[in-house]
Design a protein with these regions (language model features):
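Flexible, active-site-adjacent loop/turn segments at secondary-structure boundaries
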Residues: 101-103, 135, 139, 162, ...
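Helix-loop-helix module between adjacent transmembrane segments
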Residues: 32-35, 39-42, 46-56, 89-92, ...
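Membrane-interface helix-loop-helix junctions at boundaries between adjacent transmembrane segments
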Residues: 141-173, 187, 207
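N-terminal alpha-helical transmembrane segments of multi-pass membrane transport
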Residues: 2-158
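Membrane-interface alpha-helices at helix entry/exit sites of multi-pass transporters
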Residues: 79, 154-162, 211-221
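Catalytic cores of enzyme domains
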Residues: 240
Length: 240
């Protein structure tokens, strides 16, 4: 198989690119006008279809189990979520202040396709558009009435302060740090290193050619689950 890569947007030398024996689409299944990845599409689509089917056939039991799972995750892994978000933010600040922060996505001569205002508008619309419309008012009110962290003995002013602090934590710098890490991982390894625009490409420095096998398949399958159910939540808020 020939080496495969996506040409970057600037005059990067071949030494700057990752070359691979993998060819995009070599594992795909074609027919009936479709071009789907095997096994990522098959496993993810069948799993999602079964998940939706079980939810439709047993809505009450599904709601009970999902609620129990959500309660367990938020109660037992709250420390992990908090430290992870802080870690993402610290990482982004350190990255911006380091020499790596001067790397231009697409190469040194790359030019942005859209103006800054257009980029900012797309970031807000695609990133937190529906969520902030729904939760921008609901979340601080909900936290004020039922304070987080189990602090139920607060006075009114303390409850309001904590409610705003929790809301700012959820909608200010911390979530954007997560978006930045994912976005930079995709764009850097695609447009600067010539790899396919896949989450698994960001793991190439760690796993090398193994990302084209099951380690990479698992990463992409989990990515599909996270994207689908995340979008379903946002669309559900919009429908309400």
């Amino acid at each position: 198989m020939s080496s495969n890569h996506i040409e970057p947007a600037d005059e990067s030398t071949p030494d700057d690119l990752y070359t691979s024996d993998y060819e995009v689409g070599q594992d795909n299944l074609q027919g009936l006008g479709l071009d789907i990845h095997n096994p990522v599409f098959l496993i993810s689509s069948v799993t999602i279809a079964l998940f939706v089917l079980v939810t439709l056939l047993m809505p009450e039991q599904a709601a009970e189990h999902f609620s129990a799972l959500r309660f367990y995750l938020t109660k037992e892994l709250d420390w992990f979520f908090m430290y992870s978000m802080n870690g993402f933010l610290i990482f982004c600040v350190a990255l911006a202040l380091s020499p790596l922060g001067r790397i231009r996505i697409g190469g040194q001569t790359a030019v942005a396709e859209y103006h800054l205002l257009s980029w900012v508008s797309m970031l807000f619309a695609a990133g937190i558009g529906i969520g902030i419309m729904f939760y921008g008012v609901l979340e601080p009110m909900n936290h004020a009435m039922t304070p987080p962290l189990g602090l139920t003995d607060l006075d009114a002013q303390a409850s309001r302060d904590l409610a705003m602090a929790a809301t700012i934590y959820h909608w200010a710098f911390h979530p954007w740090a997560v978006y930045v890490v994912v976005g930079l991982s995709l764009s850097f390894f695609c447009y600067n290193k010539g790899l396919p625009l896949l989450i698994r490409s960001a793991l190439y420095p760690l796993f090398g050619e193994r990302i084209w096998g099951w380690p990479g398949h698992i990463v992409d399958i989990l990515e599909i689950f996270a994207t689908l159910f995340g979008l379903a939540t946002s669309l559900g808020y919009g429908a309400e």
